[in-house]
């Protein structure tokens, strides 16, 4: 699974995913400060699952009909430490990672929502 992490994602989350064996491309390392539209284009170019903490991607996907071919995972873990966020995200990927592609998913404390077929 190709994963593209938006720069809104804490570096600790990216590192934890990498430590767990996931190949993660990180916008902050590649092309910092690009627009959300360009991030979505980059994800589509490589059919990557886009991981973001930016709710604007929900608007791009649902209101404007701009799809991410690999799917989107929105991380809503406000107020938690970066270490705890990393643990929650890796646990979610271990349990539900196979369900994330081609869906719009939200990871929040104690809950994972997966909206099929975006």
Residue ranges, per PLM feature:
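Charged phosphate-binding loop/patch that engages nucleotide di/tri-phosphates or the phosphate backbone
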Residues: 95-118
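Short glycine-/acidic-enriched loop or helix-start segments at secondary-structure transitions
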Residues: 14-15, 36, 60-63, 84, ...
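Hydrophobic/aromatic beta-strand patches that form the interior of the parallel beta-sheet core
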Residues: 25, 51, 73-75, 105
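Mid-chain, well-packed structural core segment of small domains
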Residues: 58-92
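Acidic, metal-binding active-site segment of PIN/NYN-like and related structure-specific nucleases
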Residues: 43-63
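N-terminal first-folded block
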Residues: 2-48
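Histidine- and aromatic-rich ligand-binding microenvironments
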Residues: 31-45, 54, 73, 77-86
């Amino acid at each position: 699974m190709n994963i593209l992490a938006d720069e809104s994602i804490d570096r600790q989350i990216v590192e934890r995913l990498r430590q767990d064996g996931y190949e993660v491309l990180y916008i902050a390392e590649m092309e910092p400060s690009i627009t959300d539209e360009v991030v979505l284009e980059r994800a589509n170019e490589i059919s990557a699952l886009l991981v973001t903490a930016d709710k604007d991607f929900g608007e791009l996907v649902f209101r404007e009909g701009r799809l991410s071919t690999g799917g989107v995972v929105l991380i809503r873990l406000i107020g938690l430490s970066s270490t705890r966020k990393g643990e929650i995200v890796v646990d979610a990927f271990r349990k539900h990672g196979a369900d994330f592609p081609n869906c719009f998913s939200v990871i929040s404390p104690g809950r994972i929502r997966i909206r099929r077929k975006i």
